[in-house]
A protein has these predicted regions:
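N-terminal lobe/hinge region of extracytoplasmic solute-binding protein
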Residues: 41-110, 287
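Extracellular/periplasmic solute-recognition and catalytic clefts
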Residues: 295-306, 331-332, 344-418, 444, ...
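Structural transition elements
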Residues: 292-293, 456-503, 523-531
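Extracytoplasmic/peripheral linker and loop segments enriched in polar/acidic and small residues
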Residues: 22-26, 31, 174, 391-395, ...
Length: 728
């Protein structure tokens, strides 16, 4: 028994000593906190698609934008967002050609342009990551093509292949990537966009679909022999893309991983029999030229990005927007990226343990691609003095900013009460009704109550960060607000009531019938008893109007929108790319949801607006385009087809030791910019996770007392035995 007590005391003592080095609650291997590794989490499932032709989900972007390298990207710090070259040597302006192939001047009207030709130089010396698809033997033959079934028996990851190699990126790899977007075997979500804009894409897609039906069907559909007339390699480092007509926004598609290069060797490698059964596909193990490569992938458990040893390195930016210098975001100016050796993503199914580990220091960023953590924790700090003190004490960086998205309340242009109107007189009355409702809805109060002040009230269809957006007070909506100096103030309810009277609804009643005017809000979900709808009713009630809610499930709501059966509704839009056209198209007549199946959910139609839109969409970025945008904004502010609603904030939560963190949902390749102070992380984790040993002190004393008593009893027993022996 004495031996057991000694063992228990020894264990407790060793545990206490261990607490001086590595926290006993650490979820990671010993000393991992001291490594140049960033730890983050994912909460639902492993990425579904890492093939650039297929990947279209936000949770996949930390991987795809770190592994693949499009021609263009976005400047990490500048706002409004601006493009920069990535794999391309420079940003290029297109050459415009007419229908006869003759060159047109740069300012040629869009209607005259038949082809926009981009000749894009690619940086020489860019290499693909090491991968077995490139490996060759001593005779120069590919080691892993063709493969025999026994050779694949124990291979379930790229790390299971002994040999890897690489080769230089060429323009042909971009040509191959564009062809893959037309492949019937992939069904890329942007094939329709490419067919609309890239010369020859539609014809290639038709040819591939026909050829893929032939028998026998090969395991690999080799795209190299096929021609895509609008995408060609002029030489090893020059890519030519020909776009139908004039489409200045095409450059933004070149900043998406859809158009990132794909080596034909990788597609052929993964097409071999039994590869898919071993989870060896481009969807699971991508091959790119970016700063990181996927080196570990345990489905729904853990994924690891490691520094690509063949990545050339790119300099950290030296300029940014106002405030970036003070925020320490320019300290690494000119240093070669990436800064991290690895990024580890671990599955956390529940938010409570995820946030618990973040507050303990075991996650550097809760989730890289999600923009709600900084917002939620900022709100929590505002609501709780204890949480505010905790976050402050731990130095957490909670950074939020408006994002390129918008939520608005629309008026259905086909509705007889709030819509366009059948006559000029009715159109003017309906406009004044919409203006009155727009004044009555206090979106500042809405943002304060329901968004916890983590949003910005919108005055136009454009959010901050998009070229053409005008900040206050210049951008204030003059029909809903007054401007005095730098102060912007919502117009009074008396002005709203006067507009109602002019619209034919004095005190909220129809002047002809005396009946109260009832407006209808169409929504998804419950029956309108929640706090949001109650708030809406109170807003309209202030000017004598009544609001009735028509709530339906999602499918029926979508059907009502397609049929134009809704009257008022809330809709949202998240930008695909930071161009005003991306938002202004939501009010373009030919995009009407009812009439054309487009994204104009309000079915708004204005000849003046449509003419300006058709002019704007052909303009290159610059003062001329911004002037047209301002005119378009004036038109919709006057017509009021929307209450412009609000622009929500997005933000990140970062540990104090994470450097260069600037949240953005538009910029997806942020991992290469992050740097960590691993020593500071070790110190803080030890500080925040010190074991609480005092509850063990009484146990130690009891064990010590028991050990002393047992030892005393044993000594007494030996003494008595010795005395008996002497007596005998």
């Amino acid at each position: 028994m004495l031996a057991r007590l000694r063992r228990a005391l020894l264990i407790l003592g060793c545990s206490a000593l261990a607490a001086c080095s590595e926290p006993v609650n650490s979820p990671y291997e010993e000393h991992s906190a001291a490594e140049n590794v960033l730890y983050s989490a994912f909460t639902t499932r492993s990425p579904n698609h890492l093939d650039p032709a297929l990947s279209y989900s936000g949770d996949e972007t930390p991987f795809t934008y770190s592994i693949y390298e499009p021609l263009y990207g976005y400047h990490y710090l500048d706002r409004p967002y601006r493009l920069i070259p990535k794999a391309a040597a420079e940003l290029v302006e297109p050459v415009y050609l007419d229908a006869n192939g003759r060159r047109l001047p740069a300012d040629a009207p869009g209607e005259q342009v038949a082809i926009s030709r981009y000749d894009i130089p690619i940086k020489p010396g860019i290499a693909f990551q090491p991968h077995p698809a490139f490996a060759r033997d001593e005779q120069g033959q590919y080691r892993y093509y063709p493969m025999r079934a026994p050779d694949l028996r124990d291979a379930f990851s790229i790390g299971d292949f002994l040999h890897t190699d690489s080769r230089e990126l060429t323009a042909q790899d971009y040509v191959y990537a564009f062809k893959r977007l037309a492949s019937p075997r992939l069904a890329s979500p942007i094939s329709g966009v490419m067919a609309e804009h890239v010369r020859g894409f539609k014809e290639l897609a038709q040819q591939l679909a026909q050829d893929d039906k032939r028998s026998p069907r090969p395991d690999w559909l080799d795209l190299r022999p096929y021609t895509l007339s609008g995408v060609q390699a002029l030489d090893e480092h020059t890519l030519r893309i020909e776009v139908l007509g004039k489409y200045p926004q095409f450059k933004y598609w070149l900043a998406m991983t859809f158009t990132a290069p794909v080596p034909w060797e990788a597609e052929r490698f993964y097409s071999q029999p039994r590869m898919a059964q071993h989870n060896l596909t481009l969807d699971s193990w991508p091959v790119g030229t970016g700063p990181f490569m996927l080196t570990e992938s345990q489905t729904n458990r853990r994924h690891v990005l490691s520094r690509n040893p063949l990545y050339r390195g790119e300099p950290y930016p030296c300029v940014g927007e106002a405030g970036d210098l003070e925020a320490g975001l320019l300290e690494d100016c000119g240093k070669s990226m990436p800064f991290l050796d690895k990024v580890v993503f671990s599955l956390e199914k529940e938010s409570v343990p995820l946030m618990g580990k973040f507050l303990q220091g075991y996650y550097d960023i809760p989730q890289v691609e999600r923009g709600e953590y900084g917002v939620a924790m900022t709100v929590a700090a505002n609501d709780s003095a204890d949480k505010a003190a905790l976050y402050r004490e731990r130095g957490l960086q909670l950074r939020t900013a408006p994002e390129a998205q918008l939520f608005y309340m629309g008026f259905n242009w086909h509705d007889p009460v709030v819509g366009k109107g059948d006559t000029p007189e009715q159109a003017e009355r309906n406009r004044k009704l919409r203006q009155a409702v727009s004044i009555a809805f206090d979106w500042e109060e809405y943002v304060s109550i329901f968004m916890n002040d983590q949003a910005q009230v919108a005055h136009s269809p454009l959010p901050p960060g998009v070229p053409g957006y005008q900040p206050l007070p210049q951008g204030a909506n003059p029909y809903v607000y007054t401007v005095k100096g730098q102060t912007v103030q919502r117009r009074s309810l008396d002005e709203a009531r006067e507009l109602l009277r002019e619209a034919g609804y004095p005190d909220g009643r129809d002047a002809r019938t005396g009946k109260p005017l009832i407006l209808y809000y169409d929504s998804m979900g419950g029956m309108g008893s929640d706090a949001t709808v109650d708030w809406m009713r109170r807003q309209l009630g202030q000017v004598g109007l009544q609001l009735e809610v028509r709530a339906t499930d999602y499918n029926r709501f979508q059907d009502k929108m397609k049929r134009g059966a809704a009257q008022m509704f809330i809709w949202g839009w998240v930008a695909d790319y930071p161009d005003a056209e991306n938002f202004l198209t939501l009010l373009y007549g030919p995009q009407s949801k009812v009439d054309h199946g487009g994204e104009n959910a309000a079915n708004y139609q204005s000849d003046a607006y449509d003419r300006l839109y058709e002019q704007m969409r052909f303009l290159n970025d610059g003062p001329d385009k911004e002037a047209v945008i301002r005119e378009m904004v004036k038109v919709v502010q006057h017509d009021a087809p929307w209450m412009f609603g609000y622009v929500p904030n997005a933000g990140g939560a970062y540990q104090v030791w994470v450097r260069n963190a600037k949240p953005s949902l538009m910029i997806r390749d942020s991992l290469q910019y992050y740097r960590i102070d691993a020593q500071q992380r070790v110190e803080r984790i030890q500080e925040w996770n010190r074991p609480v040993w005092w509850p063990a002190i009484p146990l130690l004393l009891m064990l010590a007392a028991l050990a002393w008593a047992v030892r005393r009893m044993a000594r007494q027993r030996r003494t008595r035995a010795a005395l008996r022996k002497e007596e005998s």
